[in-house]
């Protein structure tokens, strides 16, 4: 497994679609995320009670994350998606030493 250097956390609310609709779309687009250069892993998130969804992305580098942020996939799947509101996209450097101790 590649070393995680950067983590991206994305959250949004659903509008105009149900959780089940979202799950269907997520299953369809997941293979597109699996092909992203520099993406080590993505955890898909769901908090149905608070209508909050999103993902935690584990990147090899901040540059790989920035390439995704400027991609057509990001624009279509997230930024310009009318069914996703209150989009939050935050990035974090990984603290290597303590993260290794805790098995990242």
Model-derived features: where do they sit?
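Short S/T/G/P-rich N-terminal loop/turn motif that feeds into the first structured element of a domain
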Residues: 1-52, 62-70, 83-104
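Conserved RNP beta-strands of RNA recognition motif
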Residues: 55-59
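A common structural junction motif
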Residues: 75-79
